[in-house]
Amino acid sequence: MSDIAETSPALAGTAPKRRGSNMPLPWKIAARELRGGLRGFRIFLACLTLGVAAIASVGSVSSALMRGLAEEGQTILGGDVGFEIVHRETNDAERAWLNAVVERGGALSKTADMRAMGRAVKNTERTLVELKAVDDPYPLYGEVTLASGQALDQALARGTDGAFGAVVEPALLERLQLEPGDELNVGNHTFVIRSAIDNEPDRVAGGFAIGPRVMISDEGLAETGLVTVGSLVDYEYRLRLPAGEQTNEAVAAFVEDTKEALPDSGWRIRDRSNSAPGIRRTVGQVALFLTLVGLTALIVGGVGVGNAIKSYIDKKREVIATFKCLGAPGGLIFQIYFLQVMAIALVGVAIGLAIGAMVPMLAQASLADLLPVPTEFAVHTGPLVLAAIYGIVTAVAFAVWPLARARDIPAAGLFRDIVAPASRWPRPFYIALTLGSLATLAVLAVALTEDYQRMFAIWFLVGTAAAFGVLLLTADLMMWVARKVGRPKMPSLRIALANLYRPGAPTGSVVLSLGLGLTLLVTISLIDGNITRQVSTQLPDRAPSFFFVDMQKAQLEPFNAILDETDGIQNVNRVPMIRGPIVAVNDVRAGDVDATPDTRWALRGDRGFTYSAALPAGSELLEGAWWPEDYAGPPLVSFVKDLADGWGIGVGDTLTIDVLGREITAEIASLREVTWQTGGINFILVFSPGVLDNAPQTILSTVTMEEAGELELQLRVTDAFPNVTSIRVKEAISSVSALLEDLVLAVRATSVVTIIAGILVLAGAMAAGHRHRVYDSVVLKVLGATRAKVLGAYALEYALLGFGTAVIAGSAGTLAAYLVITQVMQAEWAFLPVTMAVTVIGATVITMGFGLVGTWSALSRKAAPILRSE
């Protein structure tokens, strides 16, 4: 106490001065108290470590993926610059521009991608395949490795029997029960499977695939007869720029020069810095969500930090009161314990960073085959620094309040607080410091996101803050109701209700800690359940059995004849489809249109459109009027409302499309809302009759029929028309469902972090009131209560606490999920009572379990020592 005496005017000069120590007084006292170990700070440490580790792990993995995309950009794209054109090959001007690069020392490769039917010759099994035809220079970067060890050009070459070779993904061999050497019929040609594909360097850039890959040569594609006028083919042109033009600046300059030289080409341009924009966007969005979930876990842990400090201060009240009696000012008290808290926080942050840095590297072996890009996990300092900042700021935000309250309570009040804790607000400076720390967390979470992610981050934080507010109000409401109920006749219920609002009750901490995690879990579970229900249950009920794609007009009559001869046909829809880009909106070229980020996609590349005399099924007319069935006037078009709003246009404005070099301008006659979830045929653009009747087109047909005859119809149609691609809706839904299941599993796994944080905080909240619980139990036993009655009263208290928290959290999570499903995804909502029931029961059981563990320990204490100490 001599150090404090030195700072007290009343005691100045009464204590001997120590020599050889220049450490400031707050540091010395804090260090002495920390020598006693981390007892009382374990929950604090665990909460902080968990949140920091979650954020650091997610950041490290996403940084590794982003670095992989950047470093392997040339290989993933297949060139320095890539050009994608749908439906047609390059025209003379485009070809001349690309060839000029080759003449300067560059290289050019062309591939053609389309979906087709692959039929096994030996067993007539067939499946939808992703067909890719490549030329001799392919690939410009990277290497296609085959299981057979052959070179790609040898494997795809024409054999002595006249058949071209093909290499396939192993999944195709398994699905069709084939092996290398067997024959595969695609279109009008029978290929020999030469090998399975081990690695296709640019596979990631191709986007979502429904079927397995089949790779053939461009000469082999010509033999199939699949490419006709109107066929849905993606042509990819990849350039390797000359040696002196491969810097990032030179690549960017070449892309800009191309856009200026050929502004109306309609092709989609990508360079190696954005080789897989879909994956980059997905990784960014998932990483943002998981980081925000980790931040939520950290904030939930912050409640645990506050509880732990409150509990620690509660144990130190006598010491603090003694300090104050010796003349220690409030600022010194705050500094002593703030330094201790921050020292422990730094330990927790360090442990969390170590875990966050190690987890990706430990998981590399298991993740390598699952990740879409080559990734080398390493220590990424950026995510670790960010996680450390989050951890330290969270510790400050939740530590200042309880420490500031202890700072301003006088010594006599501290002694009285041992029996009945006082409730008072800290000084304005400490309130500002707390609010500033929370604001810093929010600003960091929003400022460090991409522009297109910012609104999501803002709404996530707003939702979290709203959940915090609702749960705090819930805790106050529960205590108010418990107080207003009065004194029930049942003793156990009376004790349970009194414990909910007694001084130092853990009600607020329990509701917050358990409620936030449960709210997030219910939200994710209900969103997952609704999506799964629509994809796996509702969509198959509404969707047709088949889509038949790339049918020619001349094939329509024999196709109808096959349908007439097939039993079980319930509905048939046939629609002409033309493809081309939207090149202008109200005479403004597509590249200059002021479109919102979420609608700009429709101005890039080719779009599918049709013409119709009648309003298509699944469309609702919102503005304007539909043309008469016998309309024969100037070109009119019906457009979808959400895109029109995003482009700032409406009825009376004009859209210009390009069909094989011919521009057609049409006036917008109406705006529609399309229900895409029906699984039927619909388009964003529907033209009036007479405009596109003679344009090159294919027929897209849907067939709904009884399941028993589906395979027979597929066999008959694909045998009769080798160029027609048959997409069985059930198989496509299975692929989408598998993708969704993987994504939801990852999100659920991360949400468990929040639940674990909540459980840790729950344990801390129970531990914080353990001393009071022991004293109450002893008094009740002395007054004659049996152990069973005391245990029953506490069990009822925890059951009420857990049940009330679960109901509110479940309701908040349900509201959040409802808004996401109906407003963001614009899908149908269904309440899933089982999810709600599991949440309520689980939360009640968890709360009772943790509470009764602590109560059992309290009931085991002997009465005499406790009473003597009090």
What residues fall within each predicted segment?
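N-terminal Sec/SRP start-transfer signal
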Residues: S2-G51, G278-R281, P329-G330, F338, ...
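Membrane transport/envelope proteins' first extracytoplasmic loop
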Residues: S2-I299, S311-D314, G330, D369, ...
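Short cytosolic juxtamembrane segments of multi-pass membrane proteins
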Residues: D408-S423, L859-E870
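Juxtamembrane segments of multi-pass membrane proteins
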Residues: L477-P616, V651-D653, I657, S735, ...
